[in-house]
Amino acid sequence: MKVSIFITCVADVFYPEVGKDVVEILEDLGCEVDFPKTQTCCGQPAYNSGYVKETKTAAKHMIEAFASSEYVVAPSGSCAMMVHEFSSLFSESEADWKKKATELGNKTYEFTQFLVEVLGKEDLGAELHKKATVHTSCHMSRLMGIKEPPQKLLKCVKGLEVVSLPHNYDCCGFGGTFSVKMPEISEQMVEEKVKHIMETGAELLIGMDCSCLMNIKGRLTRNGYPIDVKHIAQVLNEDRKQGGI
């Protein structure tokens, strides 16, 4: 099975270790992994700001970059969802692009979704003795409807105690350009999120989107809260036993 990694901007620039963990896990599961070097931003910041023309340009570039891919996997529900939105950018008069966009959307998956729903894997042999809580991003849970895969995977991590996060599905306040356009509201939202995280007594926050984790980690650090933050790929690649998957 051939899998192309769509690394996403935030992971590529700020969390390259997440990409490495994703690749290691997929290769150990028998996937042939590649990284199309011509990939760029999916265009979500432009899309959220109303720049449809610019978004279409980015979409066309991404469609061409992953044209020969069998599967496309992203360590982000938000960016994977944007790829699924590509087809809506093109009118019926652009039937060829619309068809290509639909094909790309159909073969694009969020990382945990791919592990559970395509590969049928839940226990990866990971081990991490921590008390953790989990934040699920808006696009991943609401638009892609992905809720169970992360839960199933984390349940199999030896030594990991996962405690429920109050109001888990509330936005962390990042929202891409939202945090720039409305910083005051964004700050209030992430402050509320951090408050709920602290209520759990967890020593580790796990998430599936690097952008959310970057936003929440920033607030945790500014508030002086000693809570570690990890992407789920980092957790699933923690102390994996030889042959555990």
UniProtKB/Swiss-Prot annotation:
GO terms for cellular component: cytosol. Pfam families: CCG. One of its GO terms (molecular function) is oxidoreductase activity. This is Lactate utilization protein A 1. Is involved in L-lactate degradation and allows cells to grow with lactate as the sole carbon source. One of its GO terms (biological process) is lactate metabolic process. Belongs to the LutA/YkgE family. It comes from the Bacteria.
